[in-house]
Amino acid sequence: PSDRVTVDRQAEGQQANRVTILLNKPLGIVSGQAEDGHAPAVSLIQPSNRWRDDNARFFFHPSQLRGLAPAGRLDIDSTGLLVLTQDGRVARQLIGEDAGMEKEYLVRVVWTGADNPAAATSAAATHAPLRPTLRAPSVATPLGLIDEGDPVTRDVQSVFPRERLARLRHGLSLDGQPLKPARVEWQNPEQLRFVLTEGKKRQIRRMCELVGLKVIGLKRVRIGRVMLGHLPVGQWRYLAPHERF
């Protein structure tokens, strides 16, 4: 029995020493392993990149990089809150089969008016660039002056049909599977706020393309109860002991 107690205490100590890190991932950084010359997110976890306002009472040590892995992912062309952890319990909570953790995103869009049905079955379909006719005028362009086929870049909310907003909330399918209901609201005339409880590959970009929108900026700002807050792009902080997803 005494041997078991010793082992249990050692296990508890090892678990307590495992860190979870919150990173504001920049554009051009991949979440997992390095690929196509792009650096992985873990390469940013260095003392020089630690947020100076991080008040968690942890000291950085290279051993904290051992086994540190992303719990979920952000596309290379997305920014915002990315969780890296050594703790399997945290990983299961965030990306386990029955996780259902809320994730909140701010999504800047333009209205193309052209649905992209290929996005329903292929994440790669969202990589196609906008047509060269895309313009961002210094003042809002009167709708009557927009040529047919031109993307609308200003006051998208005013031209985006309400029934398509309803489809974003519920009614779309990806890869042959119906999506779970999502909370989708206009944050401002060019930006939507998405709250999802699932995470298919390039899900938001594909959802938008199915209803005639093109995503031109995507930032994750919340996972569960943990907010991105004022964490600067490219910097990181520790998840404090009192914080819970």
Which residues are covered by each model-predicted region?
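Basic, flexible Lys/Arg- and Gly-enriched helix-loop patches that mediate nucleic-acid binding at interfaces
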Residues: 1-245
